[in-house]
A protein has these predicted regions:
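Hydrophobic membrane-insertion alpha-helices, especially the h-region
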Residues: 1-10
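Soluble "head" domains of membrane/secretory-pathway proteins
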Residues: 11, 15, 23-231
């Protein structure tokens, strides 16, 4: 038990994903390993988050643009969220026509074949599917459920020092840094709230299935997602 506590605190921790805000990269029913050492340690790395120190130890191990990270929600530190780092401290972020601009420069935004979403009634629905490439060369895929969604055009967000701007890959179905804290959103995320970096999908079941029902694994497990790296 002590070994398990040490591993979860300092090396990696499993997380289960609910909901669809991170499609197509991460799906509801995915189980992830999150490395706790990637950015050093803060109070939120420890069980029950005791206020033992400020900042991170060691300092200088910083998230990179495009990383998928788990963090504690600033307005409710008991809640774990997972989003992608889009804006670094000092950046100016804006979304125009569904395209992210960083410091006044639109990121590369390429249409790829539609993502096929299976609805509750069993019908397959095509969803607009994009490949986005950040200034550091990091590429990943995003979804666009509707044209001119309410977060497809925003003002300019200036990221404060020591904070990060997060976005979900399912752009029209993600509560993220585009929505401020006073509107029940994420707002800017302090460095010390970041728990770790998402690395591997070690297990995955279809939404509505229960991972502990091992007798259903032949039909409930998404076998093609096991041990998949989080990009």
């Amino acid at each position: 038990m002590l070994l398990s506590l040490v591993v979860r605190t300092f090396i990696f921790q499993p997380f289960n994903i609910n909901g669809g805000g991170e499609k197509p990269t991460i799906l509801g029913g995915d189980y992830l390993t999150v490395t706790k050492y990637s950015y050093g340690y803060s109070d939120f790395s420890l069980p029950f988050s005791p206020p033992l120190f400020s900042g991170r130890i060691p300092s200088g191990w910083l998230p990179q643009r495009g990383d998928y990270v788990v963090f504690r929600l600033p307005r409710d530190p008991s809640a774990d969220y997972i989003k992608r780092v889009i804006g670094m401290p000092g950046d100016r972020i804006q979304v125009i026509g569904g395209v992210v601009s960083i410091n006044g420069v639109p990121v590369k935004h390429e249409r790829v074949p539609d993502f096929v979403e299976t609805e509750e009634n069993g019908h397959n629905a095509p969803v607009k599917h994009w490949k986005e490439t950040l200034p550091n060369g990091k590429s990943y895929e995003t979804l666009d459920l509707v044209d001119n969604g309410y977060l497809d055009n925003t003002g300019v967000y200036t990221v404060p020092a020591g904070r990060y701007f997060m976005m979900g890959d399912n752009r029209d179905n993600s509560t993220d840094s585009r929505v401020p804290e006073n509107r029940q959103g994420v707002g800017f995320v302090p460095l010390e709230n970041i728990v770790g970096k998402a690395q591997i999908i070690f297990f995955s079941v279809y939404e509505g299935e229960r991972a502990w029902q091992f007798w259903r694994w032949p039909v409930s497990v998404r076998w093609n997602r096991l041990l998949k790296s989080v990009q």
